[in-house]
């Protein structure tokens, strides 16, 4: 698995290079059927990732945000597959705030067992497997093992979306303020929010709105290998490819030994 993880980090870097070529120039935006944005960078990164994964593991199927949908009657029989978001945070990419990522995860029996999250504009790589643990590398500095943290006395730190906020999130923050004290809010784009929890910079990332499975899988692998977890609002672990829809339930990305964050919902 360690060798496989190394190969996937190289693929993520290559996809990041394709994205940055577009990022440095004029960005043209199309709209998908659900009105979400699509750029040439999404498609270029998708091509790099899919072609390289097929070379690396020709017998392992791939689900990608930018590929044709695969009926559940087919994928329900998959024990092992790749789950990819070639460019997570397209809105951040369009805004040019650098907070977008390449997400690649290997799913086995409904769980992400290997994950790579690469933010090419930031030179920031997160990678994880059971054998290696969770690793962060900034630029060319030495990789370091990261660990999520338990909630401790003092100001709670909550990671939140830079592009997606709603009344549920506002109500959650109010409950946290009343029970634990006013939280510090860290706003960030893409799956980097989950990685903040994985490296112990935040206590929780509540996602109280829609996401797709490719948005979370790679970062969930990083978080779980760092000692944290992602649970839905019933406290159950987030699982993959269990139904026709590829939408996630609302969830909490949590640190070590977390409180029942769902009790902070009104």
Residue spans for each PLM region:
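Acidic beta-strand-loop-alpha-helix segment within the catalytic core
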Residues: 104-195, 242-266
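Conserved beta-strand termini and adjacent loop/short-helix elements that scaffold enzyme active sites
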Residues: 32, 65, 188, 207, ...
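N-terminal subdomain of lithium-sensitive/metallo-dependent phosphomonoesterases centered on the IMPase/IPPase/PAP
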Residues: 1-87, 171-174, 236
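Glycine-rich active-site/cofactor-binding loop and its immediate structural neighborhood
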Residues: 78-120
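Residue-level signal for inorganic ion chemistry
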Residues: 19, 42, 53, 90, ...
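Generic detector of well-ordered alpha-helical packing
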Residues: 43, 66, 86-89, 120, ...
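Oxyanion/phosphate-interacting regions
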Residues: 1-10, 171-178, 194-266
């Amino acid at each position: 698995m360690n060798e496989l993880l190394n190969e996937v980090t190289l693929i993520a870097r290559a996809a990041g290079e394709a994205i940055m070529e577009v990022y440095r120039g004029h960005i043209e935006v199309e709209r998908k059927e659900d009105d979400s944005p699509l750029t040439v960078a999404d498609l270029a990164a998708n091509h790099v990732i899919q072609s390289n994964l097929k070379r690396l593991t020709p017998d392992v199927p791939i689900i990608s945000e930018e590929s044709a949908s695969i009926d559940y009657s087919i994928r329900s029989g998959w024990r092992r597959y790749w789950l990819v978001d070639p460019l997570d945070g397209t809105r951040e990419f369009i805004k040019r705030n650098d907070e977008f990522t390449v997400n690649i995860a290997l799913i086995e029996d409904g769980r992400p067992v290997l994950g790579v999250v690469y933010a090419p504009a930031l030179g920031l790589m997160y990678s994880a497997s059971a054998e290696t643990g969770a690793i962060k590398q900034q630029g060319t500095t030495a990789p370091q093992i990261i660990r999520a943290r338990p909630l401790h006395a003092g100001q709670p730190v909550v990671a939140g979306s830079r592009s997606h906020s709603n009344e549920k999130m506002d109500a959650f923050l109010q409950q946290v303020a009343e029970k634990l004290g006013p939280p510090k809010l860290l706003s960030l784009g893409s799956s980097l929010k989950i990685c903040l929890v994985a490296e112990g910079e935040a206590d929780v990332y509540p996602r109280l709105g829609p996401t797709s499975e490719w948005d979370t899988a790679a970062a969930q692998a990083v978080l779980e290998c760092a000692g944290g977890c992602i649970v839905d609002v019933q406290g159950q672990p987030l699982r993959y490819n269990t139904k026709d829809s590829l939408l996630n339930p609302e969830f909490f990305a949590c640190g070590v030994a977390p409180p029942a964050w769902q009790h902070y919902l009104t």
